[in-house]
Design a protein with these regions (language model features):
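Membrane-interface helix-loop-helix junctions at transmembrane boundaries of multi-pass membrane enzymes
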Residues: 1-3, 42-55, 163-178, 292, ...
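Loop-to-helix entry and N-terminal half of a specific, functionally important transmembrane alpha helix
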Residues: 2-10, 137, 169-191
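Helix-loop-helix junctions and helix-breaking kinks within/between transmembrane helices
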Residues: 4-38, 70-74, 151-152, 189-198
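Transmembrane alpha-helices of multi-pass inner-membrane enzymes
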Residues: 25-34, 61, 158-161, 174-221
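Hydrophobic alpha-helical transmembrane segments in integral membrane proteins
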Residues: 69-86, 227-257
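Interfacial juxtamembrane loops and adjacent helix segments
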Residues: 105-148
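Alpha-solenoid helical repeat scaffolds
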Residues: 247-248, 278-282, 311-318, 344-349, ...
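Single-residue signature of alpha-solenoid repeat helices
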Residues: 262, 296, 329, 364-365
Length: 398
């Protein structure tokens, strides 16, 4: 009864979520658990010996069905699928830069941003790639992200350890636990579950449940270890949680434009939240609004190590422009256009920069003006209309 209710709830929730990754993970894991329980491997070996031709035909038919399902999942949300494929393409380019050692933990976003910037700067790309490109925090593929951060050898070692745990679990006939691990592994191919602490803890617990015996002392030892690790992290985690609560309150001042009042709060929260790109961006942007260009750029450079958002480069460029360092401002704005060429805003900033009396460049201004007026945005908005109206009124004499 309980099992039937759980299955019914899953069937209700999965379609509503419109998550193709979740559908594949649930379907694939359930199929494997059923196959293990029904001893499909032994039956397959027997059929292969007796009716090899039928098995081959069935495999070809299954492959055709799989291709059809893949096509249907693609056309369900085509731009989303293309976006994932493009993300993985850029991630693979980042992996080739440091395949053995990786770029370091928590460095994915910055590395991805640099790789995407270099790719678009080369100019050899398709129009659909410009349309679907974004500034992701994660690779939407845990295996590729691990290869970027840890390097390929360490990633393969981690995968080997997981496979060994699964093998032991199957030998011990712990099919439900192995199915849960498998579903998480399938889901990890096109999402980012292991970037969330709850999934990491769950994954480790499932792996331990695969390999541990039935001894009470083993489980007591694991429980003591879990409590010790949790207790060790508890104090710092509580401090960060409290800092995040205070940050949410300070955001009210930031969104209201009270940058002077908010700046004092950002200074006090900085030691605890300096590893969060969103916090650093707000802090640096507030300093920019207060016309404290040097301090703003110092914070923005830190944010650039944690994020691939081109708005960071835009703010840095505006800070340089405030200081009169027009060449540095131009470099930042051009980098922003390469990082996400589909955005109109950095072209608008370049047009305004080339119209500056101290940095007047009529030819470049006309090029940027034409791009701002003719480039098709992803979504039409009031901001784009206002930018176009402003640029259209600007005249730079030769």
């Amino acid at each position: 009864m309980f099992l039937g209710g759980a299955v019914l709830l899953i069937l209700c929730v999965l379609p509503a979520g419109m998550s193709r990754s979740a559908w594949l993970a649930a379907g694939g894991a359930c199929l494997c658990v059923y196959a293990w329980h029904m001893d499909w491997a032994d039956k397959f070996r027997l059929l292969w010996q007796q009716q090899r031709l039928r098995v081959v035909m069935a495999m070809i038919g299954g492959l055709c069905i799989l291709l059809l399902v893949s096509h249907l999942l693609f056309v369900l949300k085509p731009d989303s699928a293309r976006g994932r494929l493009f993300m993985w393409k850029i991630t693979c380019r980042a992996i080739t830069e440091k395949p053995l050692t990786g770029h370091g933990i928590h460095n994915f976003a910055a590395v991805y941003g640099n790789a995407q910037e270099a790719y678009f700067a080369a100019g050899d790309y398709e129009s659909w790639e410009e349309r679907v490109a974004g500034s992701p925090e994660y690779a939407f593929n845990e295996y590729l992200q691990a290869a970027v951060e840890w390097g390929v050898p360490l990633t393969l070692c981690g995968l080997a350890a997981i496979v060994i745990c699964l093998y032991i679990g199957i030998k011990k006939r712990r099919y439900g636990i192995c199915g849960a691990i498998l579903s998480l592994m399938i889901f990890s191919f096109s999402s980012y579950p292991l970037q969330l602490p709850v999934f990491i803890v769950t994954f480790i617990a499932l792996l331990l449940a695969c390999v541990c015996g039935n001894s009470r002392w083993e489980w007591i030892g694991l429980a003591i270890l879990a409590v010790a690790v949790g207790g060790f992290r508890l104090k710092n985690d509580l401090r960060i949680e409290q800092a995040c609560r205070e940050w949410m309150n300070v955001r009210v001042l930031y969104n209201a434009g009270a940058y002077e009042s908010g700046e004092r709060e950002y200074v006090s929260l900085y030691p605890l939240l300096k590893e969060r790109a969103a916090f650093l961006f707000e802090y640096g942007h507030g300093l920019h609004k207060l016309r404290r260009a040097e301090a703003s750029n110092r914070i923005m450079r830190e944010a650039l190590k944690l994020s691939c958002d081109p708005m960071i480069l835009n703010i840095m460029g505006k800070n340089y422009q405030q200081k009169g360092d027009y060449l540095a401002a131009e470099e930042c704005f051009i980098r922003s256009t390469h990082r996400l060429p589909g955005r109109i805003y950095p072209y608008y900033l370049l047009a305004k920069l080339y119209a500056e009396p101290a940095f007047r460049q009529p030819d470049k201004f006309e090029t940027m003006k034409r791009i701002v007026l003719t480039k098709e945005p992803k979504v039409q908005s009031t901001a784009i209309r206002q930018m176009r109206e402003e640029v259209n009124k600007m005249i730079v004499k030769r």
